Amino acid sequence: MANLDTQFQEFYGELQITVTKKQALITSHNNLRTKIQKYFAKNHPEYVPSFYIQGSYKMGTTIRTRDDECDLDDGCYFIPKPEVKGITLQNWVMDAVNGTVGATPVHKNKCIRVNYAAGYHIDLPVYRKERCNDNTEHPELAVRDGEYELSDPREIVQWFNSKKKDNPVLIRLVSYLKSWCDTVRGFMPPGLAMTILASKYQKKHEGRDDIALRDTLKSIRTALQANFSCVVPGTPYDDLFESYDSNRQEKFMSELNGFIEDADRAVNEKNKLKASKLWKKHLGNRFHLAPDENDAEMSKLDKLRDIGNKVLTGIATTAHNGYIHAAEGVKNVSHRNYGNE
């Protein structure tokens, strides 16, 4: 089995946001917070916004896409509840961020998205809540095409934090799966779905991220074959796959099967270059090709198997120094140790 753990560790590094972009992202999100606070202080002083970073950035699973883009979710909370419609609250936040230098705000259904020319975007979902320190009360998310709906992103973060505790490989597995979805795109599930599936069905293999990923993919497939669903572990506990029609479901499962087939071939391939090409096919161009060489451990195993076969067939010889399967030496006695009958 070609051990490509080194290539996987390098690949994980390639998926990380650069220091420069991370600094720009944080600076931009701080500037947006300031703009929103100033807007409400001037135009709606009865409402004071507070903020909470959520989503993949909070969980530590953000990746750079193949287009070198990334994002950050910054929840905008109003406590106590403003007695206005959800779209009104969204419109006010939209007004607050309009005119941001180097950026274009977009009013989406469940957030205000600020797209930056520098290659990242910041989502501003808007919430309201009656009491600040009441953990039994779930926030209400403003929806453009509706009113409000219960949504508690903190529960998702807390759930994932419990899964990743003393389990750093989980973050890497989530990143690999998100890169797979980013490579294929189209009908593939969102990053949150892959985060949930990896967390629920993770398989571990110490020191071998390639095997851990292969086995986790198989575990996910088994679960989805039994029940094609992905329930969010937080209020409102919705199923991310509920809207998938049979065509999209079949396409995703076909892609999953193809990935597993190639992952099996890669793990069992002794040539590192050939194995890395199989992984690269699904994980994208940032997965580095390995040297064109056979795995040392697999070569040793092949030699041992060869010696074993010659011992079993009675054609092995032993050299004067004790090495079996020498070019010259004393012919071995036929093997008769077949265990207890």
Swiss-Prot record:
EC number: 2.7.7.-
GO BP term, example: defense response to virus
Chain sites annotated for binding ATP 1: 56, 192, 238
Cofactor note: Binds 1 Mg(2+) ion per subunit.
Keyword Nucleotidyltransferase among UniProt keywords: yes
Positions of Mg(2+) binding: 73, 123
Annotated site (Important for nucleotide discrimination): 54
Protein purpose: Cyclic nucleotide synthase (second messenger synthase) of a CBASS antivirus system. CBASS (cyclic oligonucleotide-based antiphage signaling system) provides immunity against bacteriophage. The CD-NTase protein synthesizes cyclic nucleotides in response to infection; these serve as specific second messenger signals. The signals activate a diverse range of effectors, leading to bacterial cell death and thus abortive phage infection. A type II-A(GA) CBASS system. Catalyzes the synthesis of 3'3'-cyclic GMP-AMP (3'3'-cGAMP) from GTP and ATP, a second messenger in cell signal transduction. May make another product. Controls the activity of the CBASS cGAMP-activated phospholipase effector protein.
Name recorded for this polypeptide: Cyclic GMP-AMP synthase
Name of the gene encoding the protein in the UniProt record: cdnB
